[in-house]
């Protein structure tokens, strides 16, 4: 295999010198004149670079003949089809147009004007302003149950188990009193009186912003419940979502618990590394995780020239060591919004441990995206992989069925607690047999009128993703 570090000039030479992709053209060649000045512009170079990316990495580019082999076909053509995927200013509208010709709803482009916000949404958990702690009523006392790492409460020295007695000299008698008392703006000062080991203390805390945690631990009728909101690189923990999960799992193991409920309801996914590592924490050394069939590229000799061709690599992840939670009995909660990376975790654990699932059929997204920066500083997300379980099966477009189909959220939790308490039930359901409808043609696009370029929209468009190292 050749070194995969191509300059934009190399890509241009390969693209203009000969037909580098062996697919049939899906529209006629461009008839408009493209001047030398056009070709030297950053806008044309960005189009050319993204054409290479789609040709190399987009899973269906050649399998379904979706991408025209001539990048000039797309230059300065403002397509009207589905501009809800990604975001472009007028200068890069043809790049968005090219991406929007691909049928896959998760293959999208954001031009340089949006790139900072896009990367922040993909890599960081939401920011909050406050002290950064969770509380609960334990034995009629209001107690800190979690102090978020790198939060104002963390730096003020507060610890789990501290008993709250007053906030700003106001006696706290309920959780509602506490929540009201700690409200404020960034840089406001809050004084919290608390008891630790029978001694009274006061913490002076300046409210500030911090990355919210994505993993939460609570107990229901004596059963530990880990709720994972999303899988993200930068959170309250320096190691992201996986770091949070590992810490909470260690607490459960240290506590001697035998069963665990993992709540993945409304978890739309995130960075694949985190759901794979979290899965490995629950498995034994050598057990199979996900298998990825991934589109990539290679250069081959064609006469006196090099030719770039798309190919598909298959890789499988394994648990490299015994996970700290390998002996735990696990029950999952899932629903129709459980998607992508959270479905990978469900797939990994249920295929290895036959862990039961309570809730509703999941979303059914068994494909993955590669994200990275482009030549001009934009951001691309390209569907480049299909995902399979240890047996070579996929839930894509059909979802993962629950063992207990229950619609009411409270009843879902009650059933999960019942199963976890007994700790004997094995999974008997499988993947869905009927399409969830989420990948039907009519469901492929979101209304551009309704689109708001916010964090939720960006992460819905990403799902399960990895950050790629590509040509530069």
Regions found by a protein language model. Name each.
Residues 2-10:
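Bacterial N-terminal signal peptides that target proteins for export
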Residues 182-375:
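Cleft-lining beta-strand/loop regions that shape enzyme active-site pockets
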Residues 32-39, 78-86, 149-152, 166-167, ...:
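Second-shell loop/turn segments in exported
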């Amino acid at each position: 295999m050749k070194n995969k570090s191509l300059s934009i000039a190399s890509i241009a030479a390969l693209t203009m010198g000969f037909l580098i992709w062996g697919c049939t053209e899906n529209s006629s060649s461009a008839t408009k004149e493209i001047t030398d000045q056009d070709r030297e512009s950053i806008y044309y170079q960005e189009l050319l670079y993204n054409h290479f990316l789609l040709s190399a990495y987009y899973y269906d580019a050649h399998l379904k003949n979706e991408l025209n082999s001539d990048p000039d076909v797309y230059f300065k053509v403002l397509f009207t089809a589905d501009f809800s995927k990604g975001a472009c200013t007028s200068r890069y509208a043809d790049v968005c147009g090219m991406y929007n010709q691909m049928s896959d709803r998760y293959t999208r482009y954001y031009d340089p004007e949006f790139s900072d916000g896009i990367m922040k949404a993909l890599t960081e958990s939401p920011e909050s302003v406050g002290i950064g702690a969770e509380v609960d009523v334990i034995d009629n006392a209001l107690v800190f149950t979690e102090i978020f790492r790198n939060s104002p409460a963390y730096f003020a020295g507060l610890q789990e188990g501290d008993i709250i007695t007053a906030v700003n000299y106001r006696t706290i008698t309920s959780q509602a009193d506490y929540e009201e008392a700690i409200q404020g703006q960034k840089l406001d000062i809050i004084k919290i009186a608390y008891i630790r080991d029978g001694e009274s203390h006061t913490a002076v805390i300046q409210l500030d912003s911090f990355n919210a945690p994505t993993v939460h631990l609570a107990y229901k009728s004596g059963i530990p419940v880990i709720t994972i909101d999303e899988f993200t690189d930068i959170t309250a923990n320096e190691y992201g979502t996986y770091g949070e999960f590992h810490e909470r799992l260690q607490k459960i193991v240290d506590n001697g618990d035998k069963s665990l409920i993992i709540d993945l309801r409304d978890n739309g996914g995130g960075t694949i590394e985190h759901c794979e590592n979290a899965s490995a924490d629950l498995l034994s050394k050598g057990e199979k995780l996900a298998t990825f069939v991934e589109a990539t590229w290679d250069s081959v000799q064609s006469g006196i020239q090099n030719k770039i061709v798309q190919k598909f690599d298959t890789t499988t992840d394994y648990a490299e060591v015994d996970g700290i939670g390998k002996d735990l009995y696990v029950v999952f909660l899932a629903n129709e919004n459980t998607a992508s990376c959270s479905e990978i975790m469900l797939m990994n654990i249920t295929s290895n441990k036959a862990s039961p699932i309570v809730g509703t059929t999941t979303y059914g997204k068994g494909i993955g995206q590669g994200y990275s920066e482009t030549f001009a500083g934009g951001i691309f997300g390209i569907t480049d992989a299909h995902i399979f379980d240890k047996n070579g099966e996929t839930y894509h477009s059909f979802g993962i069925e629950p063992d207990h189909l229950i619609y009411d959220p409270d009843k879902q939790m009650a059933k999960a607690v019942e199963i976890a308490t007994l700790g004997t039930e094995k999974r008997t359901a499988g993947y869905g047999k009927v399409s969830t409808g989420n990948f039907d043609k009519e469901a492929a696009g979101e209304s551009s009128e309704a689109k708001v370029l916010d964090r939720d929209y960006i992460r819905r468009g990403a799902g399960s993703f990895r950050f790629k190292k590509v040509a530069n």
